[in-house]
Amino acid sequence: MLGLSKILRMGEGRAVKRLAKIADQVMDLDEEYTKLTDEELQAKTDELKKRVQEDGESLDDILLEAFATAREASWRVLGQKHYKVQIMGGAGLHFGYVSEMKTGEGKTLTCVLPAYLNALSGKGVHVVTVNDYLAKRDAEWMGRVHRFLGLSTDVILSGKNPAERREAYNADITYGTNNEFGFDYLRDNMAHSLNDLVQRGHNYAIVDEVDSILIDEARTPLIISGPVEGSSKWFSAFAAIAPKLTRDIHYEVDERKKTVGVKEEGVEFVEDQLGIENLYAPEHSQLVSYLNNSIKAKELFTRDKDYIVRNGEVVIVDEFTGRILDGRRYNEGIHQAIEAKEHVEIKNENQTLATVTLQNYFRLYDKLAGMTGTAETEAAELKSTYKLDVAAIPTNKENKRKDNVDLIYKTQEAKFEAVAEDIAERVEIGQPVLVGTTSVERSEYLSRLLQRRGIKHNVLNAKYHEKEAEIVAQAGRLGAVTVATNMAGRGTDIVLGGNPDIIADINLRERGLDPVETPEEYEEAWDDEIEKVRKESKEEAEKVREVGGLYVLGTERHESRRIDNQLRGRSARQGDPGETRFYLSMRDDLMVRFVGQTMEAMMTRLNIPDDEAIDSKMVTNAIKGAQSQVESANFEMRKNVLKYDEVMNEQRKVIYGERRQILEGEDVEKQIRSMLKDTIEAYVDGATAEGYVEDWDLDTLWNALDSLYGPTFTHEELVEGDEYGRPGELSSSQLLDALLEDANREYDELEEKVSEVAGEEQMRGMERAALLNVVDQKWREHLYEMDYLKEGIGLRAMAQRDPLVEYQREGGDMFNRMKDGIKEETVRQLFLVRNQLKQAGQVHVEDPAAGNEGVAVDRATQTTMGG
């Protein structure tokens, strides 16, 4: 198996052939592994671990045996054996590919193979999913196979405490969402003790729905933030003004770029409302952002589409999946403006404490791989951003899906009436229907139409996400109608006749059995239950095939072709029949922005009635062109986010690297002494730049030194004394030597006194705590300043300067100043302890391992996401 990693450098076609060869070799071992007893199969884990961890073999060397072991275990535990294409997909994941596998090809089972193989190294495997439910389900479901083979699995869920998280990360295989992994990374880099750390490195990640996580969510950075006081009154004031402003008279809106611009008439109106003379005067300058945000909240953010109001809180809805994004908040004041608009409690505006983009988080991993059903449209971005190649894995059976042409109506009302009519006809013959909508609002509108017609149906949107898996599991049954926002329910197969695995699991849980809490009883009951449900499902599936399989009906085109393809891909899995169609109207968002007015005018000229559809290649091509435009614009936006974050990323790596060294270092005294030297050197260089003693700025120097540690002599005593030759002939190097000797002597005295009171170990702990506090404080201030710099950097383009180059240059200067500030402030904080000792004759020294009050406040702050 040596040399298999060369596969990464081959063209996709050649790579897929090599993956097929590996799959054949794994399947050739089937007879040998089938004969093994359970004990012999389970013993393979320790044997393979030893060969990798002790004998020096590579994971490539043991791939065939590890895959054959996990494949046979899957059959014995789940009753499912990997097809050839699933083994190919698993091998692709091991080699760091994005394995593109169509919907229904069994990506979850595929993941078992590379997760098992890579876990044998003992360095940990992270399996990343899009939501908590899927993470928990996969950890339980696929965890049954891994646990059978003697590996530990665990899951990171939003409610878990640090101890539970640490335990989960110490498992061989850890499941969780991208948010949980990313936020734990940020929290680890705010920790003040090694005991507070939860993650144990970034060895290998398998990202499920890789396009959703690495592309759709990549524009939104992960942000841990803390509240800033005293701004809610202005959000309320402008929320009251915004409805009085008229679009195109007081302000303009660019729907494509999602920006607003206030016109002169709008400025005058606002000045009159607030009773001020000049909105742009320095003392009122911050009010401009409140005004812009109130207009954005009014025009660009729609309730039940972009967000919902739940329990008095504004909760964001993912524009791509329709799922609610608990814990995330829009940044830059947008979230507060929406809260003011909806008359709910306005939570304090937040200051960034730690942040990272998903692009840069996932690039921390030594090896990264992913799975998706639709990667071809994003292959270039996956390659350029993450260095990930796409391997298109063939389907297990031929695809029999029939994709009908789009039907286009003049109005949304006519479109939805036609949709309801089509659904009624399908229900009549018992064909299951999955309807995709783009917002909560539209899914509920269609639901009301279906209720009026007496059509039974399930609604799957952000408001009802708890029952997601159960609803999707039943969506392929005879006569089932499921209305879902976008790709809600992704990750759960729609199986004709019902998903037997999910239905059996639900049945067992209703009987009080659980694969984690009561594993033995669950496994004992599983075989009989799954056999019964599979028999029922199989019989019903035949009837569903006879009426045409699953009918997928899209009610609007999405900005991204990939999201449309994902919806279509829910139909005709594993060689089943299936059918799809999109219903559109000239008032749909995408049509309004790109083709609507021209086509609507043409339909009016041709006297086409509202309730009559057209199927026009011209419109279809215009939609494809519009989608390509939007995809390109979004790609550029993500690239732009990444370019700016690259600057922050380099700085973040330096700061987080230094923090980790401080936490892990036995002794930071040398570092403190070095900081003392660097700070005094910088002071002396600044004061003696003129060269001659009489031109030196010694008053300013001594003021700075007094603030830092308090020299034991005056500059007059030093210059006029004869220690360094004749009076007045002091050199700058002699001045520096004298000050360093004095400062180090004072620091020695501090050490002695603290050691007397609390022991030398406490002195080292105090140094570490002081250094960490200052690093965190200065880093927070730096993040704020970098945010401020980025907000205004676009204006540099007006001066014919490249904003990115200016951001890099100024950001670099600010970072260097911050590092100097860390040195200076750390030394100052420690000498303050000496001053307290001198005044009080004793000092109370906190044990840094027990925590730090300031840090505790930070950790308790709200975790949010900017957008």
UniProtKB/Swiss-Prot annotation:
The keyword Nucleotide-binding applies. GO terms for cellular component: cell envelope Sec protein transport complex; cytosol; plasma membrane. SUPFAM superfamilies: Helical scaffold and wing domains of SecA, P-loop containing nucleoside triphosphate hydrolases, Pre-protein crosslinking domain of SecA. GO terms for molecular function: ATP binding; protein-exporting ATPase activity. ATP binds at residues 86, 104-108, 493. It is found in: Cell membrane; Cytoplasm. It catalyses: ATP + H2O + cellular proteinSide 1 = ADP + phosphate + cellular proteinSide 2. The keyword Chaperone does not apply. Keywords: ATP-binding, Cell membrane, Cytoplasm, Membrane, Nucleotide-binding, Protein transport, Translocase, Translocation, Transport. GO terms for biological process: intracellular protein transmembrane transport; protein import; protein targeting; protein transport by the Sec complex. HAMAP family: SecA. Monomer and homodimer. Part of the essential Sec protein translocation apparatus which comprises SecA, SecYEG and auxiliary proteins SecDF. Other proteins may also be involved. This is Protein translocase subunit SecA 1.
